[in-house]
Amino acid sequence: MKTLLLTLVVVTIVCLDLGHTFVCHNQQSSQPPTTTNCSGGENKCYKKQWSDHRGSITERGCGCPTVKKGIKLHCCTTEKCNN
């Protein structure tokens, strides 16, 4: 019984990862680097780039969104990989 209980505790710890949250950069364009803790178990970061009347625009954040044609998208799976 003790072995079963210990096994359940270990499996729970491994599955929950002790509350660790995934971290991605979230600064826009040429702003100083900032990060955000991703919610909902998200484990990907993205960087979107496009040009408009303001010039070259960069957006960073958690997840991997769907983008329109003409927008460059880079999604990655390690923390802070989207700088």
From Swiss-Prot:
Domain of life: Eukaryota
Intrachain S-S bonds: C24-C45, C38-C62, C64-C75, C76-C81
Keyword check for Nuclease: no
GO cellular component: extracellular region
Gene3D superfamilies noted in UniProt: CD59 (2.10.60.10)
Keyword Protein biosynthesis appears in the UniProt entry: no
Keywords: Acetylcholine receptor inhibiting toxin, Disulfide bond, Ion channel impairing toxin, Neurotoxin, Postsynaptic neurotoxin, Secreted, Signal, Toxin
Localization annotation: Secreted
Signal sequence residues: 1-21
MF-aspect GO terms: acetylcholine receptor inhibitor activity; ion channel regulator activity; toxin activity
Tissue specificity statement from the Swiss-Prot or TrEMBL entry: Expressed by the venom gland.
Family label: Belongs to the three-finger toxin family. Short-chain subfamily. Type I alpha-neurotoxin sub-subfamily.
Function: Binds to muscle nicotinic acetylcholine receptor (nAChR) and inhibit acetylcholine from binding to the receptor, thereby impairing neuromuscular transmission.
Protein name, per record: Three-finger toxin W-III
Organism the protein comes from: Walterinnesia aegyptia
